[in-house]
């Protein structure tokens, strides 16, 4: 793994088009994407990916939910408040070279690995 890959985070918003909170959060998400080009960003509508969600055993009930990973290793998976400052803080904490690994659910690990494999394909 190169130094660039270690520094880059994969940041995935697990959302649904029908969710008004997700739609309201999207403009702030887009601002975060523009502000942090060093990371790889994905807006993943879970309704468009039912097979993937079933495969990893993940049932998202609260939106927006964010997965943050590095090189296929899940670092964080949780619903977050739709506030840009909260996301910035999370990225700063998890993006630090000396960041302590978080305990994450096996479903988060599986999802991070599947999404990383997609990027390599």
Residue ranges of model-derived segments:
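Thiol-based oxidoreductase modules, predominantly thioredoxin-like and allied folds used
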Residues: 14, 37-53, 81
